[in-house]
Amino acid sequence: MLAFSASLCFKENAALKAFLVSFLTLLAAASLCAAQQTDSTSATPTAATYLKLAGEVDGALHNDVLNLWFPRAIDHEHGGYHSHFGRDWQREPSDGKFSVFQGRMTWVTSQVVLREPDKKAEYLPYIKQGLDFLENTMWDKQDGGFFWGLDDNGEVTPEFGDGKQLYGIDFCIYGAAAAYQATGDKRALELAKRGFYWLDEHAHDTVNAGYFETLTRDGKPVLPHAPAGQIEAGPVGPVGYKSMNAHIHLLEALTELYRVWPDATLRARVEETLAVVRDKICVEPGAMNLYFTNDWRAIPGPDSYGHDVETAYLMLETDELLHTQASEKTERMARMLVDHALAYGWDKANGGFFENGPTFGPPEDTRKEWWVQCEGLNALLMMHQRYGKQDPIYFQRFLEQWTFIKNHTIDSRYHGTINMTTAEGKPLTEDKGSIWKAGYHDGRAFWNVSARLRELAQNP
């Protein structure tokens, strides 16, 4: 009896084991099939997929960028645009008028007219608001050039100083050039040209290429000074040195101006700046140094993943404008920048790009900033459009990036983009607008992504 029971038990266990093995095998097969279907969707998305995503991005562009900033940011009392808004988009006390913010918002309003003609009547006055302020207030009538920043009444302040910064001049030229393209107002073009001429006369480094970044009010370059070995910290980087950040945006600004004014000297400077960014600032295997001596010797520092992916886009945009098709050299470096950022700066658990880290190794700052996520979205889809048939990874990461933006970067309660979150997406900041946070990174990314998705839908 005992032997019979043991035998029966063995047979029942064997049958159960066989059933479990079969069940788990089927479950694994089903999971693999589902995974393959997901991967297949990512690798070969349909026109319907692209159009659905384009609709979502359009919604974010209008509900979380344009409809929040305008007309809310129009400063009827002082001119220009007000920058400081709380999480609920209530106006906060002014932080003054900052060249970067004023130029960027002039560019944004101009892009609305260029890309969405049905809004032209509404936005033309908003462009004029920015252009008038750049011309009548930000431009230094005494010594020329654009001020770095002023108070609301257009006066020099200790916080901003009376000097000039390449980074700020970049965006004033950028905004004025876009305003001309959108409106045909010749004073916008003349202002952009005046800014370029002043910058080229005072800041162009004719020996080493590139531009000096910190200037006195009358346009004299401020060179490095290190009493006791300590370099003065400037608003963009160490005073007297050249930076990645100011030069990638110089490339952006000069490209925008060349789009409407194909001047020979300007073209030479655009070509030079592209070469500086691609061949001196960018390095294999796809990282960028942040700061340089004036003869372009790199100063050690971390790699900024957001600037990597943004620069990939900016280089290709410039090269295509200059030569119709980007060179193999530019294509190669742009792809390396995105691939390196994915390899070292991508959050595989939550999606999205971290803030920064060493060239080789895990990230040091795992926070996630709104502009990094938006520039990442733009760059990933750009890479998918170019190389998606070879490698599905770009579209897979694009979908993950968009999911993170929808779920965490965009504020579901008050709308708009949250400046900074944890890696998991928990908000770390409250303000929706500041002198450094305009509607530029997210607006541009959403416009570009929407247009690119519709192009892809035509030829999936």
Model-derived features with residue positions:
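Bacterial N-terminal signal peptides
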Residues: 19-31
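Glycan-recognition and catalytic cores of secretory/periplasmic carbohydrate-active enzymes
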Residues: 36-460
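Serine residues within intrinsically disordered or low-complexity segments
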Residues: 5-7, 22
